[in-house]
Swiss-Prot record:
GO terms for biological process: mRNA splicing, via spliceosome; RNA splicing; spliceosomal complex assembly. Residues 187-213, 233-243 have a biased composition (Basic and acidic residues). GO terms for molecular function: mRNA binding; zinc ion binding. A zinc finger (CCHC-type) spans 99-116, 121-138. The gene is RS2Z33. Residues 246-255, 280-290 have a biased composition (Polar residues). The splicing pattern of the pre-mRNA is regulated in a tissue-specific manner and by development, and changes in response to various types of abiotic stresses, but is not affected by the light/dark regimes. Residues 174-186 have a biased composition (Basic residues). SUPFAM superfamilies: Retrovirus zinc finger-like domains (SSF57756), RNA-binding domain, RBD (SSF54928). Pfam families: RRM_1 (PF00076), zf-CCHC (PF00098). Keywords: Metal-binding, mRNA processing, mRNA splicing, Nucleus, Phosphoprotein, Repeat, Spliceosome, Zinc, Zinc-finger. This is Serine/arginine-rich splicing factor RS2Z33. Residues 146-156 have a biased composition (Low complexity). PANTHER family: RIBONUCLEOPROTEIN RB97D (PTHR48038:SF1).
Amino acid sequence: MPRYDDRYGNTRLYVGRLSSRTRTRDLERLFSRYGRVRDVDMKRDYAFVEFGDPRDADDARHYLDGRDFDGSRITVEFSRGAPRGSRDFDSRGPPPGAGRCFNCGVDGHWARDCTAGDWKNKCYRCGERGHIERNCKNSPKKLRRSGSYSRSPVRSRSPRRRRSPSRSLSRSRSYSRSRSPVRRRERSVEERSRSPKRMDDSLSPRARDRSPVLDDEGSPKIIDGSPPPSPKLQKEVGSDRDGGSPQDNGRNSVVSPVVGAGGDSSKEDRSPVDDDYEPNRTSPRGSESP
């Protein structure tokens, strides 16, 4: 049985598992032993080698497959497809446009060269006309997008409705907490100003030592909202003005009955000063002075 198989007429070989030290000239020198090499397309760790005769390509594949080259065991086999980006199509496969048309399904031309109809308005996924693949309802990408769009409003609405009351409550609580100390301070200041101790403390010690001022009638006079003097203080002020205690004043003011002869002795015994200051000279206990 012959070794050579010319069913596809392929002249392009795939060379894999190349070493990082391998260069294009090294591959060209190795494969040129089996025939004329037309092109060497070197990649990172693999390459494509093209021969001028399919039989030379088959010989190179047979002898070089699994051989150690440049420190690595390479694999050599026929390539499975037409070359990309090459301009010489004489021995590399079918020319451009020789593939299968997506519009009519016939081999030998592309969809842009198809004369069966408007190929731009046909979907390549479902085969129906009137829309393109991007707008196809059967596209898996569109199904995913539609599912995500249908779910997104539900997800976005639920947390907003639940979070809005809590945010308003938290803001109101924060405002109330920040304002509460100020209100307490204002109330404390008002209570202090209303208390009598605040008025007493505002008076200077010099004003406290001063004796109360008397008006024209002899009664103590209130100055600048100061509290009225106690009955004991009024008694002491009256005694100082008369020049002695209430008892001494009563004794010194008594007039002899000889002077008041011809009149009522009970009325003449009292001095005019005693009549004026009789209410003020009453003791706190309610007993009258002699």
